[in-house]
Amino acid sequence: MPYPKKVTIKEVGPRDGLQNEPVWIATEDKITWINQLSRTGLSYIEITSFVHPKWIPALRDAIDVAKGIDREKGVTYAALVPNQRGLENALEGGINEACVFMSASETHNRKNINKSTSESLHILKQVNNDAQKANLTTRAYLSTVFGCPYEKDVPIEQVIRLSEALFEFGISELSLGDTIGAANPAQVETVLEALLARFPANQIALHFHDTRGTALANMVTALQMGITVFDGSAGGLGGCPYAPGSSGNAATEDIVYMLEQMDIKTNVKLEKLLSAAKWIEEKMGKPLPSRNLQVFKSS
């Protein structure tokens, strides 16, 4: 299959990038950074999480951030929503899309959110129904699709079963997560073959971690199979919680650079994106793993 002519990058740095970081980023700095990202040409930014502050203290200012940002025309501002209370707060903050989440691995789901996958499905169905009543779309994250830190391999049958249940709820898109950064192109092909036999490619997104340096190679395989939506985090912000010190989220600017070199449109202005990544790197007080950011700083 030929490469697509256009790809959508969904920026998750302000949520997924910051949520596990020990450094507190002030509310006004979060707002400034999101506003910078809004002016890069990105059409989608996941700005925060409405998970209880007890679990994600780094994003305890979620409502203030959501209310404080500038809203650029044509940009969807999304947030992670764990339950109906979180959805109520997200609606108060003026969020455009609710992002729900669960694991394909039973063990990881229990350790991560203290629920069975069946219990999670029940909650997410309620959240999705309430979001639709409020005229919000719902995006679902399914993590540990390509490997679990506890169970190792996750059966493809389990991934298919949970994906079918989520789509039956009426979610608009399913983002498949490589939580431990263990995926390889052959595995990506196998998983996508199974899912694309059941679901349309335009409702599947991929969220790769670059822990072992395979994120971009995995994306090329997905592109060849018709996937046109990928998650990225500016600067590569957000480490892998199961491999301390290792790279986590794929850097948005590395994805954009690769796609541009392949003549695939993203509508993202790379230099503005790099400036935003450099800005948050300075606020974090540590080097971020993005390759293109390092080149940008040295030029």
From Swiss-Prot:
Keyword list, A-Z: Lyase, Metal-binding
Pathway the protein takes part in: Metabolic intermediate metabolism; (S)-3-hydroxy-3-methylglutaryl-CoA degradation; acetoacetate from (S)-3-hydroxy-3-methylglutaryl-CoA: step 1/1
GO function terms (MF aspect): hydroxymethylglutaryl-CoA lyase activity; metal ion binding
All residue ranges annotated as the Pyruvate carboxyltransferase domain in the record: 7-274
Domain of life: Bacteria
Pfam hit, one: HMGL-like
Active site: 240
Single GO BP term: ketone body biosynthetic process
Binding site for substrate: 15
Secretion signal span: none
Acyltransferase among keywords: no
InterPro entries hit by this protein: Aldolase_TIM, HMGL, PYR_CT
Catalytic activity, EC: 4.1.3.4
Amino acids binding a divalent metal cation: 16, 207, 209, 249
Catalytic reaction annotation: (3S)-3-hydroxy-3-methylglutaryl-CoA = acetoacetate + acetyl-CoA
Keyword Lyase: yes
Sequence similarity: Belongs to the HMG-CoA lyase family.
Main function: Involved in the catabolism of branched amino acids such as leucine.
Quaternary state and interactors: Homodimer and homotetramer.
Name this polypeptide is given: Hydroxymethylglutaryl-CoA lyase YngG
